[in-house]
Structures are given as structure tokens and as C-alpha cells.
């Protein structure tokens, strides 16, 4: 055979290239078992391999090698490999390497420079290799720490590495990289000890624990230096995609109690990971030195560029519990840290005993906690600084579902001089001054629920301490029960801005406590903007101040600590929030709710300060520059402060109040310095109100007085313009030839008239307070200029001003008992000039005077224009005192200088004309001049009677007589229909009735309507003499109303008797012609005459409800009785027309009488109605046309007629009030003439059974009446 050279070369190359892939295979069986002493051999023979292609040990049975104390050759491991990769294949058997007392690197296994792997074991146990106490032990497994020297545990059922010791790194495994994967039952690394790094595992590069479905446990491992459970030095290490429970418990090291990594470390996609009771033992850390840090995990990066640091993401449950460090990071220490997309995260009872970050510490780079879909809990963690979290870079908590920080503590000594020690009970976010401008600081954003409760700091920031802090776009934020011994019970920001914006749910600060700033302490710009609801409740600043130069004990809820030099650029702003509430906050010194040198509250929909307290000043707010403007309703209620029950303005400060989109109300506020007195605002020495304005339709209410320090002698008196007119802004004309783009566009703004109202009232004061003049007196030591709108003094209020000037487009309203006067202290020239004075009629009683007085030494009093009377409650002319003539002194005018100028004053008000309703009369005003030029105006009243208001007139009461008339008339009409064409046999019948009646309004009386319906039952019989008799009973239910304020529900019970007979009478030829003789035939010579009569009685019961003017109701009920008699006759004439079989002229006489009993209304101020009655006599006449048909047996009738009321006794009643005032109430009477039409029909259904129906309409010039009835009749 011949071979070519090319083939030979190719085959040779193939053989040599496959040679490294052909690993040597060695079986291990029970014959390889070893136990010292059992075989009589003192030494174990080392299993050495050096095949460059690698070695694979395959178990054919369970193998156990135990109690190895000596080995041959010496200085070897049980398994030593110096060649290619070394593999152990369990083939579903177990391998035990136990109590290996050897001191070679890797007592059980030593592999040089190549990979080591374990796979397919039912159980792999490496125990005590070497055992604890073995001198010079160097771990159980050692793989040379060079690239390629990996140790892999994969696809095993159980792996146990325990009680191994080493004087070097990694007591259980030391390798370049380590991979523990796909364990199906359990992996246990327990009680391994290294005097260097990695109590259980140590990798020069990375460690990977991934894809294990069984449990993985690192417990009670110890490293003298780094990583009690694992130490990984370089490259990315991962704990990834484990579906079994992964537990790190009770591991100990100087640094990184459970796991220490000097490169990126990722814990991702695991089902449940638990770090419990791990700890570090190193000394306190220095900057950029992690020694002693990370009770559970330490991830330290020498350089953070392009590094992710520690990443914990997409885990279902991650828990750090009871981990401890002696330095920083009770659970975690990381240069950079990200917690992303986890379901449940728990940090509980972790401790940094002498350092920062009880749960987490990040050194210089960013910290991020984001996208958690379950609950993230930081609870009862402890550190000297940052009880739960400490960060020196940006700290971002964003997009989480539920964040809970509770019971965490910063325990640093309260007198420590160290920076931030004892601060941040839950979170401390600190920025070095060099990085402040480029970093965000603490950023809590777009979370659904964030709760920080029960956290404690021994210095500042009970929950949060931050250099810079922003809370943005969260749904619900809760700060509850946090405590700081020094400042900021909930939050303390150090130097930079604080913002809380865009919260879509409720933000609550409640029951937080600190010596200063019960809830929030800031030093920079502080902004609360566009939040749905802000609630500050029950927060306390508890210190008792020992000096007056700092803010200790100030700011029950918020203290914005701005220096005097920063007021121009920094402030506390609360703007555009839907709801803002400060409730029951307390400060030992100033600012029960807010303490801020500069504060702006604007654009919010609803604001409430209630029940806040400050022992020194400013029950709700203490400020130097305060502006409250453009909000919805604003209320200050039940606040108290030593000075300034609601608001205190510091010396030389300014206050601006504008009610633009809602009212501002001060009520129930008190000043508690000395004796408790009503007080809304106190202005310190030199302080002033710069703006007091209300937009049209809105009011500022001062139910508690304002107080103000007296001006210094010779000092400048500032002007206060009330409701100033803001002029329209008109853009300037553009230059003719200039380019349009170069001209700035100035927006057009309309003039703002500010025509709202400022009210000073004592109406809500307790009677014991209102009886003391000082409690009802507002003092404004300013020159008041009322430019527009209204100033109202009511219910005993006094307004003291330096001077008062009124512009013509404004009005001063005053009640009896109120006072407008100038002050007396350091006031020499204060004057009062009124141009439009209006006096409240309701308050005039002849006892209390309206006082206008100038008390300055040289000022004058001038009143001009027309005096006006206003009637606030609209009830003055209902006062029974106006029944008689009166003389009422009501206006007292005086001036110390004696100058009272009334030259241009018209004291006969145009508004004093006789009213439309109430007591009638006329006024005359008489001025009386007394000593010193004092002028008293006396109002003289000449009484002329009483005119009730429409709601008191009650025309529906007499009109109910017409309702009874309509009802009884309709009953008789129904009986007439039922008796028409009645058979001669006895029978019974039943029918239904419906009525609708409307009467138009007349000049004095309201219109009314009636709707009633009911039923009627009757029977009839005919005597042999052809006399027909009938009897009937009926019941009706009615509703009527008067289109003003009253309505009546009625029930009617009625009985009727009816008789009918017919005769034939001869007619003379002159009587046979009639008005329609040209259309209808004349009457025959002998004509039948049909006579009928009816007598009816009805009892009517009425229940009336009246809506009275004071939003109450009056109830009445009474009875009335109806009597009706009707007699009449008709002359039926037969015809032979196809569609008209007969016609009948007729005439009737109807008499109706209704009598009504007197009654009294049930109401706060009841009316009494006397008895009344109605009598109406009418004569109806007309023609009835009839068409009869045999098939089917039926008859149709049409009646047209005219009626005149020949006699009427018009209904009316005497109406009285309990005070004796009375008037006559007349019914809205019907006109006397009526036209009516009725269509009716009868149809025979069966033998003895027929039905009937009719509909009619009666028209009068002022009323319409409609009736419909139907029924059926059975004849025996």
C-alpha cells in the first residue's frame, strides 16, 4: 500500500491536535476508601496526576477518605494535580473527605494552574480539611491563583464544605475564580476559618453563585481580614438566578462579614437571599479605607470609574437582618450601590456600632434604590450617624411601590464635635462642599408610598439629614413620630435647598419632635409646590430657650433658618398646593406652625392653620417678611402664642395679606402672654402691613383683633393702602422703523379694582371676652388709605388707626356699638376723613352708638357724601319695635381738637325710603350738637303699619278653599256622567277622577295650582214612577303649590245624593224658537223636560309645608268642609241627522260653600290663621249634542256652555304673628265668567255591563281647569 505525503502530514497533525482534549479517566470506588487505623496503614497514599490533557475521576460507588493524619509522599494533598484540568464526576455517588490533618496548600485537593470541577455528586462533603486547631493548615481546596485556575461546583445534589481552616486565603476553597452552580438540594459552607481573607471561599478574580435550585448556606465562617464567607478580589462577582434560599448567617471578618469584594458585585434574579447576624470586627474606618466595614457585604472600589459597584436587582426577596459592623455599614458598605427592581427588600436590626450607616453606607459615589415592586423596609437599624442609610454621593430613591423606614436610630453623642455624628435617624445624605453644585444630594421621587416613622437622632434629622434634599412626584409621603434631640424632628437640611413638589397623594408630617424645628429644619431655599395635600399635625419644638439669639425651641412644624443677609435671595415658599394644613403643632418659643424669616404662601386651593401653639410668639407663623396671597380659602383658627395668636411679625418686618381666590379668616386665636386675650396678629416694633387687599367677592375676616407696637416718638408713620388699585399694564408703542423682533413684547394686564371686603368683628368672641374693650380693639399704627372695596366694623369691634382716609369708590360699613378712632400714643395729627359711610339698620337699638372719634391732639374729623343705611340680614323692618314711633340715637362724632366737619355730609340716607315689606314708616335724621363740637345723630321713626313678605303672606291658605271648590265640583261632574243614559234597572258603578287646575298670579297674590286624583263608587235605581235616585262615595288625594314657598297635600272624603226625573210639557209657539233656530229645528209643541238635583258634602284635610327665609320650615294642618247643591233642567230634542240624533238646551244653578277652621303653624316664629269661608253661586247654561249608534251600542255627547258666578263671598283670612302683628290674606280669586266644554261617551260591553268616560275643560280669564274621569257600570 502506498500513502501520499500530504495525507501523512494531515493525519499526523490531527492526532497531535486532539491529544490535549483526550483527558485521562480514573475510576474511584469503595476500594479507594480510607480511614486512618482501619486498614492498618498509618499514611494515606496521595493520588497524584500530571497528565497534560487533564484528569477525570469518575466515582463508581460512594467514596470516603477520613482521618488522614499522614500522607505518602509527604507534603502532598490527598489529590494533587500538576497537569491539565482536574475533574471529579460523581455519577450520582457521594465523596467524603473528612478530618484531613495535612498542611499542604489544599489538604484535600491541590490543583496547579488549571481548572478544577466537581459535578454529578449526590453528596460532596469536605470536612475539617484541615480541622480547626491544625497548626499550619492551608485550607481544603487550593487552585493556583492564576488565570484559568477556576474551581467549579455544578450539577450536584449536595455540597458541604465545613470546619476547614487555613492560614492563607479561603479555608474551604482558594482559586483564581469560583463557581457554585445548579445545586439541587443543598450547598452548605459552614464554620470554615481563615486567618487571612475568605473564611469559606476566596477568589483572586471573581466568585459566582448561580442557578442553584437547592438551598445555599454560608454560616459561621470566619476570616481574620476580609470576607467571612466569601472574598473576591478582582472582576465581577455574582449571586445570580438562585431559586433556592440563599443564606449568609453568622459569618465574621474584619471587613465584609459575609462577603467582601474589591470589584463589582451583583446579586440579581434570586428568589430569596438572607443575610443574618453577620459581623465585622475591624476598628473604626478611615476615609477611603473599608477596614471594619460592611457587616454583611463590603464592596470597595479603589477607583469607581466605569464600575457598577454593588448591584442588588430583580430579586424576589432580599433580607439583611441583625448584621453588625464596628465601623461603617451595618449590613452593606459600598463605594457605589444600586438596589433595582427588587420585590421585597428588608433591612432590620442592623448596626454600625462605632460608625455610619446602620444598614447601608456608600463612600463617595452614588446610591440608588429604585423600581422595587413590593415593600422595602429599613427598621430598627442603628449607627452613630445615619441610622439606616449613609451616603456621601447622590442618593436616589425612585419609582418604588412601598418604602418604609421605621425605628432606626442615629446614636452619636449629642455633644459630639464630630461632623454629623448623631444625625440622620434613618437617612444621612452628605455632600462635600466641592461637589454641592454638581450633585443632587438626596432625591426621593415617583414612589407610591414612602413612610418614615419612629426614627430617632441624638442630634439632628430624626428621619433625614441631608446637605441637599428633594422629594418629588411621590404619591403618599408620611413622616410620623420621628425624634431629634437637637433640630429637625423629621428632616434636617444642612446648607442647600429643600424641595417637596408634585406629590399626588397626601404628604403628612405628624407627631415629630425636636428641640428646634419639630418636623423640618432647613437653611436654604425651601419650597413646597404643586402637592395635592400637605398636612403638618402634632409636631413639637420642645426646647426651653436659654438665649434669644438662636432658634432653639422655634418652629413647631417648620423652621427655615435664613440669616438676615440671605432674606433677599432665600425664603420658605408654599405655592400652588391643593390643600395645606398645619394642625396642633407646638413650639416652646416662636412659630407654632412655621418659623421663617421670609415666607410666601400663594396659589394654593385651601389653607388651614388650626390649634397651633407657641409659648413666646406666633402661634401659627413667626416671620419677618410674610406674604399670603392668591390662595383659595385660608383660615387661622384656634391658634395661640405669647404674642401674635396666629401670626407674629418680627421687628421692622412686613406683612402682606391678599384674598384673591378665596376668603382669609382669623377666628378663635389668642395671645397668651400674661392674661389670655383674643388676638390674630401682632406686629413688632417698626413692623408694618404693606398690603391688605381682597378681590371682588372675597373677604378678609378678623374675628380676633390685630395688635401693633406703638410707634417711636418722632418716627416715620408708614401708609397702608387697603385694596389698592393695580393699574393696567399697556405695552409701549413700537418704534416706527425699528425691527419688530428687537422690541420686547410687554403683556397687557387689566386693572385690578380690589373691591373686596375687610371685616373687623367681635361676633365670634366668647361673651366674657367681648365685654372687655381691649379684646375687641384692633390697633394699626399706620396711615390707612381705603382705596377701594369695603371696610366693615361689626358686632362691637373697634378699629384704632393713626389716621384714616377714604377714597370715593370705597365704603365704610359700621354696626351699632362699633368704633373707628385714632390712636393716642405718639399721635399728634392723625385725622379721619370719610366719604362714604353706611350704617347697619339691623343693629340699631337706641342703646349702642356708632362712634367715630379723633383722639389726636390736632387732627380733625370730616365726613362727606350721603349717609347710607344697609340691612345686612334683611330683617330690620321685621323688628316688632317698629310698630310704634321711635327716637334712636345711633351716631356719635367727636374730635379732641373740636373740629367735626359735616359741611358736605347728607345725613338723610337715600336708602332710608319705606321698605317694600315689613313695618312701614318714614325716617327723619336729626343732628344734635353737644359740648366740644360733639355731634350725635338721632334717627326718628314714624310708624305706618305692616306689609308682610310674600313668604309670610300665605295666600295658599285661603286658596285651599278654591281647591276644595274644584274637587267637590269634579265629583258632581263624575256623578252626572255616570247617570247620563243610565238604564232603568238598579246598578252599581265605580270610576276614577283626575283634576288639574291652574290660577294665574295676580298683582298682589301669587298664583297656584292643584293636581288631584281619586275614585268614586256609587249605585242607582229607578222607581216605577220613573224617578231615578243615586248615592255615591268618593276619595281624592291632592297636591297644590303657590310657586313661592308653600305646598299643600290634601285628602278629600265626600258623599253625594242625586235625583232625576222627566216630564212632557207643552210649549207655546213663541217659546219654541231659540237662538239657533236657523241651524237647528225649533222645539216641538210637546217637549220632554228632564230635571235633576245633587247634594254633596266633603271633608278636606290639609298639610302645608312652608320654606321660611331663615332656611327653616313651617308645618301646618287643618280641616275644611265643603257643601255643594246643584239643580237644573234640560229639553232634549230628537233629530233625524246621520251624525246627530238629538240636542238638549239646559240651565243649572250651582251653590258651593266651603268653611275652613282656624289653626296655628308649627315653626320658630309661627303664624296664626283665623277661620275663613267661601260661597259661590253660579248659573251654567248651554247645549248638549248627542250621537247614538246601535252597533256597537254606544252614545257620544258634546256639551258647550257658559257660566256666570252670580254671587260670591270672596275667601280671605286674618293672619297674625305671635307678637300681635296681623294682616288680611286674600285668596287669588277666579274670574266670574267661564266657558266650558265636555266630551263624554257610553259604550255597552255586555248585557248589563257598560263603561263611560268624559273629559272637560273650563276656561276663565285667569285660570284653567281640566277634568278627566272614566268608569264602568253594572245593571242588575
Curated annotation (Swiss-Prot):
Q: According to Swiss-Prot or TrEMBL, what is its membrane topology?
A: Peripheral membrane protein
Principal location: secreted
Q: Which InterPro entries match?
A: Autotransporte_beta, Autotransporte_beta_dom_sf, PbH1, Polymorphic_membr_middle, POMP_repeat
Per UniProt, the keywords (alphabetical) are:
Cell outer membrane, Cell wall, Membrane, Secreted, Signal, Transmembrane, Transmembrane beta strand
Where do the coiled-coil regions begin and end? Answer: none
Q: Where is the signal peptide?
A: 1-23
Q: Which GO terms describe its cellular component?
A: cell outer membrane; extracellular region
Which SMART domains does the entry mention?
Answer: Autotransporter, PbH1
The segment(s) forming the Autotransporter domain are 981-1276
Write out the similarity annotation: Belongs to the PMP outer membrane protein family.
Classification via PANTHER family? G PROTEIN-COUPLED RECEPTOR-RELATED (PTHR11319), OUTER MEMBRANE PROTEIN PMPC-RELATED (PTHR11319:SF35)
Q: What is this protein called?
A: Probable outer membrane protein pmp6
Amino acid at each position: 500500500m502506498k500513502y501520499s505525503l500530504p495525507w501523512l502530514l494531515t493525519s499526523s497533525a490531527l492526532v497531535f491536535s486532539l491529544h490535549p482534549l483526550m483527558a485521562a479517566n480514573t475510576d474511584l470506588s469503595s476500594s479507594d476508601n480510607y480511614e486512618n487505623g482501619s486498614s492498618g496503614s498509618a499514611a494515606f497514599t496521595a493520588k497524584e496526576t500530571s497528565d497534560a490533557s487533564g484528569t477525570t475521576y469518575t466515582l463508581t460507588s460512594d467514596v470516603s477518605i477520613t482521618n488522614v493524619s499522614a500522607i505518602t509522599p509527604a507534603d502532598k494533598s490527598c489529590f494533587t494535580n500538576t497537569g491539565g484540568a482536574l475533574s471529579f464526576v460523581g455519577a450520582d455517588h457521594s465523596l467524603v473527605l473528612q478530618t484531613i490533618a495535612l498542611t499542604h496548600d489544599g489538604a484535600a485537593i491541590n490543583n496547579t494552574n488549571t481548572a478544577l470541577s466537581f459535578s454529578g455528586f449526590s453528596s460532596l462533603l469536605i470536612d475539617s480539611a484541615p480541622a480547626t486547631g491544625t497548626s499550619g493548615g492551608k485550607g481544603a481546596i487550593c487552585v493556583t491563583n492564576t488565570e484559568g485556575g477556576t474551581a467549579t461546583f455544578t450539577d450536584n445534589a449536595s455540597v458541604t464544605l465545613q470546619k476547614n481552616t487555613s492560614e492563607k486565603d479561603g479555608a474551604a476553597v482558594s482559586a483564581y475564580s469560583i463557581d457554585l452552580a445548579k445545586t439541587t438540594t443543598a450547598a452548605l459552607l459552614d464554620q470554615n476559618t481563615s486567618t487571612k481573607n475568605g473564611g469559606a471561599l476566596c477568589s483572586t478574580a471573581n466568585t459566582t453563585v448561580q442557578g442553584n435550585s437547592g438551598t445555599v448556606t454560608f454560616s459561621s465562617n470566619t476570616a481574620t481580614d476580609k470576607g467571612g464567607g466569601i472574598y473576591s478580589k478582582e472582576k465581577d462577582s455574582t449571586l445570580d438566578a438562585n431559586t433556592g434560599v440563599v443564606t449568609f448567617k453568622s459569618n465574621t471578618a474584619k471587613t465584609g462579614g459575609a462577603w467582601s469584594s474589591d470589584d463589582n458585585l451583583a446579586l440579581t434574579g434570586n428568589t430569596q437571599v438572607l443575610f443574618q447576624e453577620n459581623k465585622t470586627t475591624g476598628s473604626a474606618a478611615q476615609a477611603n479605607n473599608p477596614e471594619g466595614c460592611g457587616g454583611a457585604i463590603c464592596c470597595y472600589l479603589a477607583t469607581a470609574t466605569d464600575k457598577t459597584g454593588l448591584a442588588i436587582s430583580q430579586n424576589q426577596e432580599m433580607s439583611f437582618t441583625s448584621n453588625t459592623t464596628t465601623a461603617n455599614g451595618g449590613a452593606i458598605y459600598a463605594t457605589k450601590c444600586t438596589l433595582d427592581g427588587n420585590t421585597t427588600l428588608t433591612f432590620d436590626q442592623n448596626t454600625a456600632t462605632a460608625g455610619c450607616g446602620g444598614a447601608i453606607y456608600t463612600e463617595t459615589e452614588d446610591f440608588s434604590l429604585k423600581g422595587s415592586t413590593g415593600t422595602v423596609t429599613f427598621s430598627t437599624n442603628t449607627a452613630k450617624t445615619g441610622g439606616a442609610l449613609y451616603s456621601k454621593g447622590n442618593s436616589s430613591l425612585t419609582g418604588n411601590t412601598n418604602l418604609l423606614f421605621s425605628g432606626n436610630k442615629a446614636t452619636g453623642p449629642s455633644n459630639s464635635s464630630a461632623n454629623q455624628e448623631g444625625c440622620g435617624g434613618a437617612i444621612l445624605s452628605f455632600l462635600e462642599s466641592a461637589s454641592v453644585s454638581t450633585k443632587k444630594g438626596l432625591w426621593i421621587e415617583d414612589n407610591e408610598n414612602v413612610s418614615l416613622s419612629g426614627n430617632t437622632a441624638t442630634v439632628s434629622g430624626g428621619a433625614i439629614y441631608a446637605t441637599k434634599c428633594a422629594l418629588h412626584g411621590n404619591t403618599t409621603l408620611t413622616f410620623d413620630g420621628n425624634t431629634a434631640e437637637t433640630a429637625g424632628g423629621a428632616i434636617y437640611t444642612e446648607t442647600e435647598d429643600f424641595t417637596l413638589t408634585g406629590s399626588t397623594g397626601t404628604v403628612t408630617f405628624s407627631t415629630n419632635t425636636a428641640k428646634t424645628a419639630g418636623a423640618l429644619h432647613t437653611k436654604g431655599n425651601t419650597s413646597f409646590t404643586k402637592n395635592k395635600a400637605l398636612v403638618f399635625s402634632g409636631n413639637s419644638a420642645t426646647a426651653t430657650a436659654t438665649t434669644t439669639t438662636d432658634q432653639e425651641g422655634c418652629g413647631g412644624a417648620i423652621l427655615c433658618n435664613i440669616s438676615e443677609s440671605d432674606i433677599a435671595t432665600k425664603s420658605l415658599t408654599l405655592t400652588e398646593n391643593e390643600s395645606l394644613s398645619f394642625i396642633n403643632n407646638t413650639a416652646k418659643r416662636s412659630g407654632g406652625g412655621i418659623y421663617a424669616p421670609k415666607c410666601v404662601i400663594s396659589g394654593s386651593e385651601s389653607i388651614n392653620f388650626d390649634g397651633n401653639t407657641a409659648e413666646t410668639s406666633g402661634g401659627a407663623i413667626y416671620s419677618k417678611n410674610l406674604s399670603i396671597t392668591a390662595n383659595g380659602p385660608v383660615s387661622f383658627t384656634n391658634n395661640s402664642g405669647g404674642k401674635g395668636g396666629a401670626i407674629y411679625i418680627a421687628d421692622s418686618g412686613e406683612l402682606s395679606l391678599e384674598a384673591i381666590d378665596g376668603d382669609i379668616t382669623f377666628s378663635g386665636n389668642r395671645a397668651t402672654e400674661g392674661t389670655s386675650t383674643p388676638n390674630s396678629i401682632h406686629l413688632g416694633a417698626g413692623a408694618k402691613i404693606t398690603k391688605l387687599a381682597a378681590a371682588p367677592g372675597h373677604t378678609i375676616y378678623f374675628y380676633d383683633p390685630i395688635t401693633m407696637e406703638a410707634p417711636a416718638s418722632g418716627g416715620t408713620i408708614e401708609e397702608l393702602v387697603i385694596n389698592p388699585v393695580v393699574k393696567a399694564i399697556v405695552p409701549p408703542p413700537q418704534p416706527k422703523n425699528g425691527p419688530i423682533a428687537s422690541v420686547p413684547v410687554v403683556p397687557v394686564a387689566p386693572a385690578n379694582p380690589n373691591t373686596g371686603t375687610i371685616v373687623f368683628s367681635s361676633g365670634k368672641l366668647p361673651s366674657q371676652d367681648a365685654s372687655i374693650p381691649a379684646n375687641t380693639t384692633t390697633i394699626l399704627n399706620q396711615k390707612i388709605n381705603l382705596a377701594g372695596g369695603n371696610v366693615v366694623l361689626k358686632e362691637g369691634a373697634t378699629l384704632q388707626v393713626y389716621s384714616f382716609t377714604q377714597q370715593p369708590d370705597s365704603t365704610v360699613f359700621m354696626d351699632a356699638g362699633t368704633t373707628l378712632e385714632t390712636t393716642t400714643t405718639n399721635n399728634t395729627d392723625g385725622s379721619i376723613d370719610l366719604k362714604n359711610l353706611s350704617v347697619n339698620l339691623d343693629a340699631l337699638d337706641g342703646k349702642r352708638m356708632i362712634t367715630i372719634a379723633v383722639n389726636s391732639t390736632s387732627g380733625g374729623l370730616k365726613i362727606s357724601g350721603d349717609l347710607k343705611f344697609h340691612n345686612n340680614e334683611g330683617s330690620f323692618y321685621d323688628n316688632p319695635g317698629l310698630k310704634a314711633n321711635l327716637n334712636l340715637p345711633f351716631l356719635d362724632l367727636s374730635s379732641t381738637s373740636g373740629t367735626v366737619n359735616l359741611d358736605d355730609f347728607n345725613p338723610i340716607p337715600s336708602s332710608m325710603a319705606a321698605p317694600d315689606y315689613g313695618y312701614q314708616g318714614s325716617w327723619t335724621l336729626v343732628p344734635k350738637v353737644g359740648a366740644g363740637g360733639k355731634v350725635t345723630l338721632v334717627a326718628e321713626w314714624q310708624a305706618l303699619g305692616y306689609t308682610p313678605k310674600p313668604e309670610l303672606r300665605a295666600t295658599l291658605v285661603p286658596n285651599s278653599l278654591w281647591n276644595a271648590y274644584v274637587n267637590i265640583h269634579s265629583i258632581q261632574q263624575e256623578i252626572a256622567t255616570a247617570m247620563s243614559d243610565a238604564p232603568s234597572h238598579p246598578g252599581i258603578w265605580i270610576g276614577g277622577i283626575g283634576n288639574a287646575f291652574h290660577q294665574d298670579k295676580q298683582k298682589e297674590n301669587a298664583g297656584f295650582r292643584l293636581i288631584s286624583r281619586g275614585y268614586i263608587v256609587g249605585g242607582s235605581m229607578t222607581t216605577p214612577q220613573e224617578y231615578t235616585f243615586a248615592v255615591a262615595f268618593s276619595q281624592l288625594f291632592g297636591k297644590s303649590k303657590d310657586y313661592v314657598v308653600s305646598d299643600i297635600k290634601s285628602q278629600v272624603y265626600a258623599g253625594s245624593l242625586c235625583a232625576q226625573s222627566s216630564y212632557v210639557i207643552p210649549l207655546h209657539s213663541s217659546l219654541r224658537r231659540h237662538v239657533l233656530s236657523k241651524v237647528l229645528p225649533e222645539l216641538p209643541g210637546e217637549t220632554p223636560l228632564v230635571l235633576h238635583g245633587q247634594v254633596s258634602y266633603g271633608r278636606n284635610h290639609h298639610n302645608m309645608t312652608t320654606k321660611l327665609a331663615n332656611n327653616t320650615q313651617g308645618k301646618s294642618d287643618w280641616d275644611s268642609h265643603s257643601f255643594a247643591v246643584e239643580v237644573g233642567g234640560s229639553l232634549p230634542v230628537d233629530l233625524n241627522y246621520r251624525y246627530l240624533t238629538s240636542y238638549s238646551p239646559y240651565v243649572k244653578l250651582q251653590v258651593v260653600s266651603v268653611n275652613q277652621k282656624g289653626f296655628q303653624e308649627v315653626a320658630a316664629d309661627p303664624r296664626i290663621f283665623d277661620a275663613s269661608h267661601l260661597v259661590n253661586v253660579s248659573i251654567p247654561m248651554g247645549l248638549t249634542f248627542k250621537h247614538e249608534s246601535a252597533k256597537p251600542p254606544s252614545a257620544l255627547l258634546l256639551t258647550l256652555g257658559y257660566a256666570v258666578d252670580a254671587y260670591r263671598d270672596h275667601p280671605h283670612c286674618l293672619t297674625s304673628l305671635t307678637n300681635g302683628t296681623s294682616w288680611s290674606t286674600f285668596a287669588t280669586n277666579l274670574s266670574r265668567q267661564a266657558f266650558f266644554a265636555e266630551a263624554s261617551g257610553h259604550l255597552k260591553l255586555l248585557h248589563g255591563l257598560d263603561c263611560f268616560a268624559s273629559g272637560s275643560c273650563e276656561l276663565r280669564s285667569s285660570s284653567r281647569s281640566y277634568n278627566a274621569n272614566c268608569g264602568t257600570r253594572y245593571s242588575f
